[in-house]
A protein has these predicted regions:
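N-terminal cap/lid segment of alpha/beta-hydrolase-fold proteins
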Residues: 2-12, 17-28, 36, 40-54, ...
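Post-His helix in hydrolase/transferase enzymes
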Residues: 364-382, 392-399
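Short glycine-rich catalytic loops that host catalytic nucleophiles or stabilize transition states
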Residues: 141, 353-359, 384-387
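Serine-hydrolase catalytic core
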Residues: 289-362, 395-402, 407-419
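Primarily recognizes the serine-hydrolase "nucleophile elbow" in alpha/beta-hydrolase
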Residues: 170-174, 182, 210-282, 291-308, ...
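Cap/lid segment of the alpha/beta-hydrolase catalytic domain
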Residues: 144-145, 155-218, 265-267, 371-386
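Ser/Thr-rich low-complexity repeats and stalk/linker segments
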Residues: 32-87
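Short beta-strand-to-loop junctions in surface cap/lid or active-site-entrance loops
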Residues: 22-25, 139, 146-159, 166-167, ...
Length: 419
């Protein structure tokens, strides 16, 4: 009898899964495939070819893939390699609490190039969740603040985190729900193209983000000693601004961001910091039928751009830059090094740069599929994010752990709650 063993069959997306095939002839080429449908019905799929051992088994923790979407020993490769059938789609979970992704794992007892066209010898359907049992989601419409607050089970107080994404707009909750599953009170913060917020981001109104940080500090289940900020891309730029100007922010994680105000000017009361304009004429076509925006952002070292550099030396707490050195959207390693250099110049010693070789722009939570290119709602062409498959996915595993460890070390959390 041919079979598949998968453990665990119900898990969070950032948890590893063990996959074994058994009951096959020895030294036989087989095909393992995975697929799922997202909430809009789009299919994402992956496959790899293996050769069974002398006992007719394949163990993804030991057996190397001979080909397919990846090669070598890669226990999570079928999850990491999930790619869209419709070009330029990105796998994003929106209903993070109510339902999991159902991942269909299929075993074919021979080489199958188009595995879904034939009946598999064995199948398993597993659940991949974005929120642990007991995590609570609260939709936030408090003053001007719009978002979703995720609370771990228990009384707290919990370390608070403001969580933001980039220029995709809307409200993305999947990182916050996972952070809450790991013990953080995380506010997934929208800042444009959501609810009654502006459709387009015309300027960065720091008062809005200050209100969000204070809301989180004031929540009875969140420590009032300060909050962390986690953000990527344009959101990371805003996170660095928040760290530099807002006393509520005590720890900041910038994922592939910049070190200056770009495209949209910063407004904070009477303070106005003009942005460095994007150089749209520098968009570069790539082999992926998409465009690289690496050179869109002008050099902040130019004399005319000096006033736009973010004064991170004023930040109350430590700052961690997580960067992929194959980022094809931002020159993020350069920006991180410039930020660290400025901090050291002014005597701030708690700015850290963690660079991941061969990783691209979209450093997502562990277990997320590799997304080298996608099309967003606010850019007219598909964009290349960069990175190499295996190093990028391994970097996601590492940086997801480092991000949490950094936040736990640096967000002070009182022992008694405020209820």
């Amino acid at each position: 009898m041919v079979g598949l063993t998968v453990s665990p069959e119900i898990s969070l997306v950032d948890e590893p899964v063990k996959i074994q095939a058994w009951g096959l002839p020895p030294d036989q080429v087989i095909t393992l495939g995975a697929w799922l449908k997202d909430e809009k019905g789009h299919i994402f799929h992956s496959r790899a070819f293996y050769k069974t051992d002398m006992e007719g088994k394949v163990d993804l923790e030991k057996t190397p893939a001979t080909g397919g979407d990846f090669q070598g020993v890669c226990p999570m490769g079928l999850f990491w390699a999930l790619k869209p059938k419709i070009q330029f789609k990105q796998l994003i979970k929106h209903d993070v609490v109510g339902s999991p992704f159902l991942v269909h794992l299929e075993l074919y007892s021979s080489f199958e190039f188009n595995p879904r066209e034939d009946s598999p010898a064995a199948t398993k359907v597993i659940e991949r969740w974005y929120a642990a049992p007991g995590v609570k989601r609260i939709l936030i419409r408090e003053g001007r603040v719009r978002g979703a607050l995720f609370l771990p089970p228990g009384e707290g107080p919990f370390p608070g985190v403001v969580d933001m994404f980039g220029a995709v707009g809307g409200l993305l909750e999947y990182r916050s729900s996972l952070l809450a599953s790991r013990g953080f009170a995380s506010l997934a913060l929208a800042y444009f193209a959501y609810d009654d917020l502006p459709i387009f981001l015309g300027e960065v109104d720091l008062k809005y983000f200050e209100e969000a940080a204070q809301f989180l500090c004031d929540h009875p289940k969140v420590s009032s000693d300060g909050v962390g900020v986690v953000a990527i891309c344009k959101g990371a730029e805003i996170a660095l601004i928040m760290a530099s100007y807002l006393p509520q922010v005590t720890a900041t994680v910038c994922i592939n961001g910049t070190n200056a105000v770009n495209c949209m000017s910063l407004v904070y009361g009477d303070l106005i910091v003009k942005a460095i304009p994007y150089k749209m004429e520098r968009l570069l076509s790539t082999d992926f039928l998409s465009y690289s925006a690496t050179n869109l952002i002008d050099d902040p070292r130019k004399p005319e751009n000096q006033y736009s550099i973010i004064p991170l030396e004023k930040a109350r707490g430590p700052i961690l830059f997580l960067v992929g050195n194959k980022d094809q959207h931002y020159n993020s390693l350069f920006f991180a090094r410039e930020a660290k250099s400025r901090a050291e110049k002014y005597g701030k010693k708690d700015v850290y740069v963690q660079c991941y070789p061969e990783a691209g722009h979209l450093l997502e939570p562990s277990g997320s599929p590799f997304c080298p290119v996608s099309k967003g709602p606010f850019f007219p062409v598909p964009l290349t994010w960069g990175g190499e498959f295996l190093p990028h996915c391994k970097a996601q595993e590492t940086c997801w752990k480092e991000l949490q460890e950094f936040l736990r070390r640096n967000i002070r959390c009182a022992r008694q709650n405020k209820l």
